Amino acid sequence: FGSQYTQLIARRIREIGVYSIVKPNNISLKAFKEINPKGIILSGGPDSITKSRKIRMTVDIKKLKIPILGICYGMQYIADIYGGKVSKSTTREFGHSIFKIIKTSKIFPKRIAGKQIDVWMSHSDKVTKVPNNFRITGKSTNSNISSFSLEEKNIYALQFHPEVTNTKYGKNIIKAFIIDICKCKKEWTTKNIIDEKV
């Protein structure tokens, strides 16, 4: 969705040892199927879900049967298309915030279960109601809904940015999604880049 951190998400995944690629929101269904991903991450972005002409995915993610992680705008997008509610915040939240895990979730490794952690926020909209059947898993200093999930369908949403170094345990959260939830194998290294270019 055009976040300044999008490439950083891909980098974090590759650091784990898993191949990842960045594609635009308007990728065609045909191109999407050709990639055949094991999971997708919906990035943040500068747009607002509350606008009438907001940025949307061309692919209907509600029909996908693979794990989904929404970050920032990606979280708000999931809330919106599944029938939740997103509202404009009175003040933009940017910078450090305290996030508290209030429900267990596969996206949060056991070592951080129930903890309060420092996270990095960058958003002006907020989810005020989660969709039916989804459950709130975390809250922050300025929001009662900072993460939610639909565990049985492997759909997860985070308002904060786990990909930036300012978020404590961010790499662990991304790894939990990639390895434990998407079941990806660590088969990619920088040597793959050299082999592809040669």
Model-assigned labels for residue ranges:
Residues 70, 74, 79:
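Gly/Ala-rich beta-loop-alpha elbow adjacent to hydrolase catalytic centers
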